[in-house]
Amino acid sequence: MNIFQTIVLALVQGLSEFLPISSSAHLILVPELTNWTDQSLAFDVVVHMGTLSAVIFYYQAMIKCLFFDFYHSIIKRQTIGESKLAWGVLLGTIPVGLVGMIFRDSIATDLRSVEIIAYATLVFGVLLGFASWFSHRNKNQKSTISWVDIGFIGMAQTLALIPGTSRSGITITACMLVGLSRKLSIQFAFLLSIPVISLSLILILIDLYHQAQLVNVSLLAMGFVVAAISAYVTIVFFIKLIDAVGMMPFVIYRLTLGIFLFFFIL
């Protein structure tokens, strides 16, 4: 990888990780459309570390609160403050973690085609549009999350293992479908990203441990910085944009991309 490829792929990771457009799909598509070689495992590690750092930095105050209330809920064996939300993040991660580990090899080899990405981009784009429409018309949006909601959202998140689905997209979709407010939907979806990205990072590190690779430290450092900054800016921008215009710009983008990909594979 050269400097230009490093910047482009780190930007793709940082910009698409928290937008409902699928970072995994874009990281597959960019090398596919440009004939670049796949990025190294070491590069995957640093850009995931970058996006993880961004979301932790953005939600640092809330994360401290969640840890505090989670700890005291265990000690006192009762719900305290935001402890239910903390438990929700933990329990909502279990389904995708289990499915991801069980079907890891199949996902890595059988679900990376442009055709699958095209179908997932279109189908889950339409679903995101419906959920946004439903949420807009729902006059009784919930400001708290139930255990049933957590179970449904956690199961829905397993669909993010299909490239083109978008982890943030499917979790926000599920949140809106169960009636959560838009603010809580985005907040819960982004908090869920922390353990999920962490699990992905651990698995990549395990693979990297078993594969000796020569690395360019300066390019890796650049990838981390670009991914972290672009991810943080994206989080800030996305939250403000959603308040102003809703999800439709991303629905339109997904439908346009999906149609383009079908023309590409024909």
From Swiss-Prot:
Domain of life: Bacteria
Gene Ontology molecular function, alphabetical: undecaprenyl-diphosphatase activity
Pfam families: BacA
Entry EC number(s): 3.6.1.27
TM helices/strands, residue ranges: 1-21, 43-63, 83-103, 114-134, 144-164, 186-206, 219-239, 245-265
Keyword hit for Cell membrane: yes
Subcellular location: Cell inner membrane
Bilayer topology: Multi-pass membrane protein
GO-annotated cellular components: plasma membrane
Catalytic activity line of the entry: di-trans,octa-cis-undecaprenyl diphosphate + H2O = di-trans,octa-cis-undecaprenyl phosphate + phosphate + H(+)
Keywords: Antibiotic resistance, Cell inner membrane, Cell membrane, Cell shape, Cell wall biogenesis/degradation, Hydrolase, Membrane, Peptidoglycan synthesis, Transmembrane, Transmembrane helix
KW Phosphoprotein (keyword) present: no
Record GO biological process: cell wall organization; peptidoglycan biosynthetic process; regulation of cell shape; response to antibiotic
InterPro entries referenced in this protein's UniProt entry, alphabetically: UppP
Entry similarity comment: Belongs to the UppP family.
More about this protein: Bacitracin is thought to be involved in the inhibition of peptidoglycan synthesis by sequestering undecaprenyl diphosphate, thereby reducing the pool of lipid carrier available.
Functional summary from the UniProt entry: Catalyzes the dephosphorylation of undecaprenyl diphosphate (UPP). Confers resistance to bacitracin.
PANTHER family cross-referenced by the UniProt entry: UNDECAPRENYL-DIPHOSPHATASE
Record protein name field: Undecaprenyl-diphosphatase
